[in-house]
Amino acid sequence: MEFKLLLVLCFNIGLICSQKTKPIGSKPIAVTTAAKTPATSTSPVTNGTGGPKFDLAALQKLLATFQMMQGAQGGNTAPSSSLPGVSSMPMPSANQISRKSNINANSLYQPELMNTNVPYMGNSLQQSRFQNQFLGGQFAPNVNVYRTNNHISSFEQMRLTRSYNLDEEQKFKILEEHNKFRSDVVQKRGTGAMNVLRWSEKLAAQASLEVMNCSYVNQGRGASLASVYEKYTGSSLVSEFMSRWSDEKNRFSLGENCSIQQTCRYSQAVWANTKQVGCAVQYCGDMSFIACSYSPVGNTVNQIAFSPSRGGICSACTTPPNMPVRCNSDHLCEWY
């Protein structure tokens, strides 16, 4: 239903006037104005000649309503006003809202809390997207659940600058693929303490030492290596080497030595206690060498990558004293 509301401020007589037109196929919408109600917290305004007074607060309220109506009809920005106390109201459309919007003072993503301190059952919006992925259909009790965007933590850095031959898109792709691995483990194998991975530039610098000499030899710094033909670039480069690590999943056996099974790259990618990753690329002739370093490092002798749990999603996340347990919509622990 379309309608148009035109507000006119008649300064010469000091009244609030309204002009309206009929919505198509409907009755006219009644508009109430209060022309002579004394304004609160502001001095009464006259027309300068002792004429009738009008209520500035009422005008501001009506103008705000008009701006909201304009935004609902598809406008991205409501018209601004020259009146004191009435500012423009930006109304971004859905396709203008990106992963990097709504940042806080610390230049992090503004976390979007999906629920607080109740077992998560899903509302109509999330249910269709997430319910079939739930292990048992419920998060653990007393868990704060935050929404992720493309498997990126709600608390990830706002910007990831280009370094070590990786641009921002590739870095976010690396995080996305790693967290997909980890979320898949929670859903299919069951663990209540799988941390979400975030980017570390310090680890990226460490990883660069593994590939700087164009050598496919692990230097013992806890890095995972891969070599990819140079025809792969951009996000396809990341997808290619991550798919090779994913192939190790078919041979992975929880509790077995990863070096024997030749699954150490996948095992490290899903090591539950790991919190950060940083990667680097070195171009060497017709090959690209990639290394990723992790912290805390995984593949520890006599330890397993993750522990199955029946306590619910995020039931065993480690949390500082007196702080709430944080989880996300990918079923990964949001660490502090």
Swiss-Prot record:
InterPro entries the record matches: CAP_dom, CAP_sf, CRISP-related
Official protein name in the record: SCP domain-containing protein 1
Gene3D superfamilies reported for this sequence: CAP
Compartment(s) where it occurs, according to its Swiss-Prot or TrEMBL record: Secreted
GO cellular component, one term: extracellular region
Keyword Cell membrane: no
Region (Disordered): 73-94
Organism per entry: Lottia gigantea (Giant owl limpet)
Glycan-linked positions: 47, 213, 257
Species classification: Eukaryota, Metazoa, Spiralia, Lophotrochozoa, Mollusca
Keywords of this entry: Glycoprotein, Secreted, Signal
Sequence ranges assigned to domain SCP in this UniProt record: 175-292
Biased composition (Polar residues): 73-85
Tissue expression: Component of the acid-insoluble and acid-soluble organic matrix of calcified layers of the shell (at protein level).
